[in-house]
């Protein structure tokens, strides 16, 4: 942690900020944290209350429950195990559909490249008809090159919010869209 290099946080202007949502997975709630000098935390807290209305008391109580030791121990194994299983299932199916994968060993999504120069924009055109969509690679291009982007044939497929029971249906929808384009 960066904090080990700070002798006295209350005598500094340093903010150490993080988020605890990836491993704790609480639907509908995002939890972040800030470590800083007490005076800075008070100012930040005042702004949060004034500028954003603050966080509801039930949300605060729920957030505290998320950090109970037993829940954290369970989340540290259950979340990676679940995502690993989903990553493997979807990854195998995507490869069988002729997609190239550019994914790591963690996370809850796959980066895929469509075959034959097909664009993710065209893929979404077919997916929209089925009530589905993917995140187009061009939307992640920091240079905003649009159709000239080298990411035009890439898309991100997020399996994090999907129930395991939807797998067959998800793959069937994607397969129909890809077949229509290739």
List each language-model region with its residue ranges.
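Conserved core segment of the aminotransferase class I/II
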Residues: 4-81, 176-178
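PLP-dependent enzyme catalytic core of the Aspartate aminotransferase-like
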Residues: 9-10, 129-130, 142-182
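Short, conserved active-site loop motifs that form the nucleotide-linked donor/cofactor pocket
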Residues: 14, 99, 132
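Short amphipathic alpha-helical segments
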Residues: 29-30, 106-108, 153-156
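Short hydrophobic/aromatic beta-strand micro-patches
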Residues: 35, 111-113, 158-160
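Conserved glycine-rich beta-strand-loop-beta hairpin in the small C-terminal domain of fold type I
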Residues: 64, 80-91, 101-113, 150
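Surface-exposed helix-capping loop/turn segments at secondary-structure junctions
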Residues: 74, 94-103, 182
């Amino acid at each position: 942690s960066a904090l080990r290099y700070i002798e006295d946080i209350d005598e500094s202007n340093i903010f150490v900020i993080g988020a605890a949502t990836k491993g704790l997975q609480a639907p509908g709630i995002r939890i972040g944290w800030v470590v800083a000098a007490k005076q800075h935390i008070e100012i930040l807290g005042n702004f949060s209350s004034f500028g954003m209305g603050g966080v509801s008391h039930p949300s605060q109580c729920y957030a505290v429950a998320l950090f109970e030791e037993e829940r954290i121990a369970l989340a540290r194994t259950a979340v990676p195990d679940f995502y690993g299983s989903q990553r493997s299932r979807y990854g195998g199916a995507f490869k069988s559909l002729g997609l190239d994968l550019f994914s790591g060993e963690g996370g809850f999504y796959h980066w895929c490249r469509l075959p034959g120069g097909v664009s993710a924009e065209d893929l979404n055109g077919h997916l929209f008809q089925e009530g589905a969509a993917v995140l187009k690679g061009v939307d992640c291009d920091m240079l905003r090159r649009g159709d000239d982007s080298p990411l035009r044939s890439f898309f991100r497929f997020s399996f994090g919010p999907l129930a395991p029971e939807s797998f067959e249906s998800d793959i069937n929808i994607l397969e129909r869209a890809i077949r229509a384009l290739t």
